[in-house]
Design a protein with these regions (language model features):
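Short beta-strand/turn micro-motifs at beta-sheet edges
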Residues: 38-44, 222-225
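Proteolytic maturation boundary segments
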Residues: 28, 126-238
Length: 271
């Protein structure tokens, strides 16, 4: 569906039930449990139309396309039948709200949002109001859009591995295109040039004042600082050792993403 469509927010949540950033979607679990090499649901909402697609990669040599497709459809039907918990549903709504808030933390993403809003005919208030729309979405809304858009009316494209013949085309004898108005400026560009530039002094981080340092163990130091923009926190772990000295670290980082805790299984911990 398009970015302005009334079903766009609910469809995003339906797709996130299959794949999400936390790796707890139904298709994510197929990969974690090594039932498929890859499975990904995509919902791309553009200005006037949208793309809803599912990409599947069967296990090489030992799995057929039909069996892999059946596995994916079984998981899609779980969403269509409302087979997901309220806890998972509310967690995905919260994740959507977190993404909206975190996208406002830096000027680059804010500029991209403004550009997209302009092309979609929306205002900045429309963007802020979308958070309220997320909160108002119900489980019934998600089931309804899943049944509507994950239908049997779809195009299936299959790609086989191998080598294909290539046609080597000669370089055409075209002359370089010289733009007519390369030196011209629009009225908008001229208006921007008239805006005076402000000298902004860099703000250097002072680790003594801006960062709280806590020595947890002789080998572990915790650095914390408040988020001045919202109540979202980010937790990063950095090891003072390189992969050349200890190559196992490269595998460890991938393994840690699949673990839970002593009291919480993987799905609950990641959600």
């Amino acid at each position: 569906v398009s970015a302005n469509h009334e079903d766009q927010v609910a469809l995003n949540i339906a797709v996130n039930l299959l794949n999400n950033a936390n790796g707890t979607g139904y298709l994510d679990k197929l990969m974690v449990e090594h039932k498929l090499m890859g499975a990904l649901a995509i919902n791309e909402s553009m200005n006037e139309a949208g793309i809803l697609a599912v990409a599947i990669m069967p296990k090489l040599l030992i799995q057929s396309y039909s069996s892999a497709e059946k596995m994916v459809w079984d998981e899609i039907n779980r969403v269509k039948n409302g087979d997901f918990s309220d806890e998972m549903f509310n967690s995905l709504k919260l994740e959507q709200k977190r993404q909206y808030a975190s996208s406002l933390e830096n000027i680059d993403s804010r500029a991209t949002i403004m550009m997209n809003l302009f092309s979609q005919g929306k205002s900045w208030n429309d963007y802020l109001n979308e958070v309220a729309r997320i909160e108002s979405i119900t489980k019934e809304d998600v089931v309804r859009v899943a049944q509507k858009y994950f239908s049997n009316n779809y195009l299936c494209v299959t790609k086989s591995t191998g080598k294909y013949p290539k046609d080597n085309l000669p370089k055409p004898a075209f002359s370089p295109v010289v733009p007519r108005n390369a030196d011209a400026s629009s009225s908008y560009a001229k208006q921007l040039e008239k805006i005076p530039e402000q000298q902004v002094a860099p703000r250097i981080i002072d680790f003594e004042k801006d960062v709280k340092t806590s020595k947890l163990t002789p080998l572990v130091t915790l650095y914390t600082t408040p988020n001045p923009l919202n109540d979202i926190f980010t937790f990063n772990i950095s090891y003072g050792i390189g992969a050349l000295e200890q190559p196992e670290l490269m595998q460890l980082t991938n393994y840690l993403q699949l673990l839970g805790t002593e009291s919480l299984p993987f799905e609950q911990f990641r959600s």
